[in-house]
Amino acid sequence: MNLHDLQNISENFQSTQRMPVLFLGHGSPMNAIEENQFVQGFRKAATEIPKPNAILCISAHWYTPGTFVTAMKMPKTIHDFYGFPKELFDVQYPAPGNPELAREAAELLLPAEVEEDHNWGLDHGAWSVIKHMYPEADIPVIQLSIDYTKPPQYHYDLAKKLHRLREKGILIIGSGNIVHNLRLIDWKNINTVGAGWDWAAEAREKTNNWLVDGNFQPIIDYQKQGTSLQYAVPTPDHYLPLMYTLGLKDQSEELALFNDELIGGSLSMTSVRIG
């Protein structure tokens, strides 16, 4: 692709006011079909920002060796879970894709190598939250995978290259959970909002303080921040989408938290809006 081709792609998205960026704590797949305070928070977030021209989602559930971007015209709805009710498997979110946006994102991320993908689709980290925000499924959605061979700092820096998409009305969403330790779930309080082990509460408080203070380096270097963060992030898959949201923040922009609750002992639903 040459610069002329990229210019033609870019012209498909009219310049508009800078779109905010979100990190959404997606929690259980059941949030896709339940009515609770968290899905209400997702809906409210959508009402507080301009309607996007398209959505680029970085989901915890597309965790790959290397970086890929969905480039099909009609991504399938992926039910990447098991042991849930049939009602959840019946959910379809038929949003269109956007191959042109996929190519532009890949071009912006150079010299990182980003391969176009035509097999993945929309996993539940994407559709389970976006369906509440935009139930009409009339906004194109693409996904960018997370390269699990790279450290948090790499993902934070990579995100900065996507900044110009914000100026074109593209909503960039990181979808995961800051505190996410499925092995230590408190099954007696699996649906109890506010239920959290002491270490989970400490990890949430630490990260919240760093977030609101704009002090992102300790968040990036979470492995150096003590026992509570080690328990909160036993594997980085659900944590790394936050790096993309934070990497897109301008110094002067405001950051706000919402859905800021622990649930089930070892999960946080804390979500972030920038801009």
Mark where each language-model region is:
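A short aromatic-anchored loop/beta-hairpin motif
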Residues: N2-A112
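Beta-strand elements within well-structured catalytic alpha/beta cores of enzymes
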Residues: P20-L24, A54-S59, L144, L165-I178, ...
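Short, basic/glycine-rich phosphate-binding loops at helix/coil junctions
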Residues: L22-F23, D80-P85, Y134-I142, I220
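Secondary-structure boundary elements
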Residues: T47-N53, L108-V114, P151, H163-I173, ...
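Short glycine-enriched loops at secondary-structure junctions
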Residues: A60-T64, M74-P75, L122-I130, I178
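Flexible, glycine/proline-enriched loop segments at strand-loop-helix junctions
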Residues: L88-P96, S145-P152, L229
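Internal, conserved structured core segments that host functional sites
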Residues: A102-Y156, K161
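Surface-exposed, charge/polar-rich loops and edge strands
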Residues: I139-P140, K150, D157, H163-L171, ...
